[in-house]
Amino acid sequence: MNIKNKKTIVIKIGTTSLIDEGRLSQTLLRSLAENIKQHQNTHNFVIVTSGAVSLGGMELNYKTRPKSMKKLQVASAVGQIQLINEYKKVFNENDLQIAQVLITKNLIDDREQFVNTTQALNELLAQNIIPVINENDVVATEELKFGDNDRLSAIVSIIVNASKLILVTNKQGLYNFNPDKNSDAKMIEFIQFNSSQLNDLIPISSDGEGEGGFSTKIMAAQIAGFSGIQTQIISWSEQNFVDAIEGKQVGTLILESDKKIRLRKLWIAYGMQSTSKIEIDDGAFNAIKKNASLLCNGVVKIHEDFNIGDGIDVVLNDINVAKGIAKISSNEISDNIVLIHIDDLIIL
């Protein structure tokens, strides 16, 4: 079947699902490969995998996950070799060809890099080669990191024009309360896309392994949803995976949004960390709703100092109404000067 006639599914597998008692789960990898093989005639598959830092840390006898950038980079560099070799061995046993792809956040702002990455991934899929993707931690900086593979997988979903993003985690899906702390927590099977409803679910949990808790999974669903892509959050089992591929109800299914937003603005909204918060008046809010830039004279209060290029939360009446990138620093504030340009501003 031609690549254009196949649906593309992006599968993100988290560290807590992939690592079993300090080792890569052979059961999961074999089941993943076997079921991809069975569905390869009708679907293209892209894998976004975690696990490199954990595997590298164990190889280097780190007792806990490193916190410094240098140690994270070393652990990732060591672990990435083991990770991709295990994928290659298991997938080759099922006559599947994989390709390692390491990417950085630069591709969001660099049009040429974005186009090149898109072309490379599409060509791999056209040749029935399965891209196995991870962030290039070794060359990334704090400022130029996705920070977690949940949001990376959402960006990849956009690049390959996926029909669905499947997030494999150690929980059955999204819950109305943190199931680790509340025995009455109930799993939510189905969510109509609504950013405010999803935002209400963000403070749920954070896992001990890896960098992505449930908040980043919700952000990934928001990024994907605003690009017309469904997200399904499941715990790993062979049946759950097959059901998700075949469109059956399992875990939590988050539908796509009717509204589409450009990738750069999606990253500003859900991927970029804010360093400051500013309060604005009604006039400024009405102006940005009409597609105008945010001017300094609409700012009522600055909560923290900021520099050019910093992320800023924009607040009206104690509600986060927008987010953007500072065009000037806080000590340059002056009437009628643009604080956040409309191209770097998104209303939430």
Regions found by a protein language model. Name each.
Residues 1-62, 68-97, 101-348:
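C-terminal catalytic "cap/lid" subdomain
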